[in-house]
Amino acid sequence: MSRFSIEGKSLKLDAITTEDEKSVFAVLLEDDSVKEIVLSGNTIGTEAARWLSENIASKKDLEIAEFSDIFTGRVKDEIPEALRLLLQALLKCPKLHTVRLSDNAFGPTAQEPLIDFLSKHTPLEHLYLHNNGLGPQAGAKIARALQELAVNKKAKNAPPLRSIICGRNRLENGSMKEWAKTFQSHRLLHTVKMVQNGIRPEGIEHLLLEGLAYCQELKVLDLQDNTFTHLGSSALAIALKSWPNLRELGLNDCLLSARGAAAVVDAFSKLENIGLQTLRLQYNEIELDAVRTLKTVIDEKMPDLLFLELNGNRFSEEDDVVDEIREVFSTRGRGELDELDDMEELTDEEEEDEEEEAESQSPEPETSEEEKEDKELADELSKAHI
């Protein structure tokens, strides 16, 4: 595949006017059949973007644009125009299916060029928008642009969107209704990664039940470092059955909670032929009973599991179940459990609270208030129509 790259050269391109500057792009100028252009790791000003735009627009065979980290050191007023020029050129590339714009400090100021491009570029299949500082308002507008893209794709019978990588963008709960609509409108997605976006339980619930549960061809889902608690975990437990092709599930640092993790593991236990290859569950307050159930699920229903991450949870690396999980992998001749070197220990106060709760519940013949609340929540979630 013909590829042009100046990756990582740390060039400060304010304008491309001298012969030395143009010589850097000589190969690009000569190759009309180039399929991939990599500009990452350089800083591009407005006039340089104008020159590049004029020359990129003619590359009708271009398939991949790697434009991550191309505005370091640029003032916020300069970035929108430079971005607009580059994206206008990409709109003229009919085979361009992969666009990487990560690690650019767009913030809210550069949202308009993005919105215009994302709503119009129907060949798009793989979008990388990671660490762009969007915030919830700009994030919601980006989501609406992708909804418009779905309409335009359908009108042109264009290939479906397959990947959305949009992490570290402070999307928060405020944009989740729009993102849920986006996932409803792009139901053939294979990969969704929305890590570290400050999404809290109510937003997670909406995202899962009103959005991602509709994406039944999903293979990779990564929501690490958002906050689930029992509410979000219960929604995940419902949604799991919607993804029969899921191969990777990333839930590290999601605060599933003991009850939430138990609900997720219980949901796994009710599925058949689980094709997961990677399951990341670090730092989620998972307790021993849930791990025991998970071991049984892995043994009986996850024959393809290769990577399991459980560090930072509420059980000991000395517990028998840890050796039992490793024995399952050893017997198969494949599979790996991460190092359990940072396990969380319950404080004396937490242990006393749990003992008191258990003692107070055990003699009660009637349903406790907590159980009533759990049942009401389960009933409410079960009404969600997918």
Swiss-Prot record:
SUPFAM superfamilies: RNI-like. It comes from Schizosaccharomyces pombe (strain 972 / ATCC 24843) (Fission yeast). GO terms for biological process: nuclear export; protein export from nucleus. The record marks R74 as: Critical residue for GTP hydrolysis. It comes from the Eukaryota. Signal peptide: none annotated. Residues 338-359 have a biased composition (Acidic residues). Residues 333-386 are annotated as: Disordered. Belongs to the RNA1 family. Keywords: Cytoplasm, GTPase activation, Leucine-rich repeat, Repeat. GO terms for molecular function: GTPase activator activity; small GTPase binding. GTPase activator for the nuclear Ras-related regulatory protein spi1 (Ran), converting it to the putatively inactive GDP-bound state. GO terms for cellular component: cytoplasm; cytosol; nuclear periphery; nucleus; perinuclear region of cytoplasm. This is Ran GTPase-activating protein 1. The keyword Repeat applies. Its main location: cytoplasm. InterPro entries: LRR_dom_sf, RanGap.
